[in-house]
């Protein structure tokens, strides 16, 4: 992220999506006013109509309205980035936005880094997977992603949850064998 410039680019957008796990349309709808730098949070309360004529729309569901905690480095970077931008205007939207444009930029970055190509939505999945592997509860991950229920999270990340459960079984068995 040290290569990022001090002007708004899709790279900043990709960084924010990967650090927060928010949806593409939620990230597009962000305005400087949505950032609470002193509390290190980001308010998600709307989406951007990128498939239609542009403009703000409601979130996917009631649970999608949420505050996402951010790390201090991201807070510092975005405080500087949005400092002189209009409070109520979307940070990343200039004219018509195509999902394919942003996915193309991400694809180029993936290829340059020599890693498998993923989409912007793939960044959301990666974010959630990293949290689950770090031991964050399913309930917390569901809240952070704005899922309507934990069931959504459990279904979507079943493969990871199963992998973690088999790790847990190993830990349990080791603990039990040490009880002699």
Residue ranges of predicted features:
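Phosphate-coordinating loops and pocket residues in cytosolic domains that bind phosphorylated ligands
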Residues: 29, 37, 155
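Structural motif
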Residues: 34, 39-41
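C-terminal secondary-structure termini that scaffold catalytic or DNA-interacting sites
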Residues: 39, 52-76, 80, 84, ...
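Active-site/catalytic core of tyrosine-dependent DNA strand-transfer enzymes
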Residues: 47, 71-116
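Short basic/aromatic active-site micro-motif
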Residues: 9-11, 95-100, 116-135
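C-terminal catalytic core of tyrosine-transesterase DNA break-rejoin enzymes
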Residues: 15, 19-26, 105-110, 124-148, ...
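Basic, Lys/Arg- and aromatic-enriched nucleic-acid-binding interface segment
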Residues: 2-30
